[in-house]
């Protein structure tokens, strides 16, 4: 049995925001409240990055249109005693999926620790 660090990405929609910074803060705050309410304080929350098509530099994964934003959120957690990396991903998706209902989750990274 091996331990893994699993990172998943989730889109989160935020409404009635003023700017990008507001969207980022509200998205992280809302996800944090949901996870903490279910006792999942051990999940690390961060903003995803994407590559700017013009300059090639990494930028925050957020799009704001008409005071509504979609924010790419990274969720990382350690999974202990998994049989394989695939098993660790299934455990992470199951744990987060039950808490973050109706929010799709995608694998970003799995590292053996």
From Swiss-Prot:
Belongs to the UPF0212 family. Transmembrane segments: none annotated. It comes from Methanococcus aeolicus (strain ATCC BAA-1280 / DSM 17508 / OCM 812 / Nankai-3). InterPro entries: UPF0212. It comes from the Archaea. The lineage of its organism: Archaea, Methanobacteriati, Methanobacteriota, Methanomada group, Methanococci. This is UPF0212 protein Maeo_0273. Pfam families: DUF555.
């Amino acid at each position: 049995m091996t331990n893994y660090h699993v990172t998943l990405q989730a889109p989160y929609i935020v409404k009635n925001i003023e700017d990008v910074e507001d969207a980022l803060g509200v998205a992280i705050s809302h996800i944090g409240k949901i996870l903490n309410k279910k006792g999942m304080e051990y999940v690390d929350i961060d903003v995803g990055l994407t590559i700017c098509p013009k300059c090639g530099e990494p930028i925050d994964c957020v799009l704001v249109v008409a005071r509504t934003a979609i924010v790419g959120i990274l969720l990382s957690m350690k999974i202990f005693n998994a049989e394989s990396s695939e098993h660790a991903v299934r455990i992470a998706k199951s744990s987060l999926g039950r808490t973050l209902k109706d929010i799709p989750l995608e694998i970003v990274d799995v590292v053996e620790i």
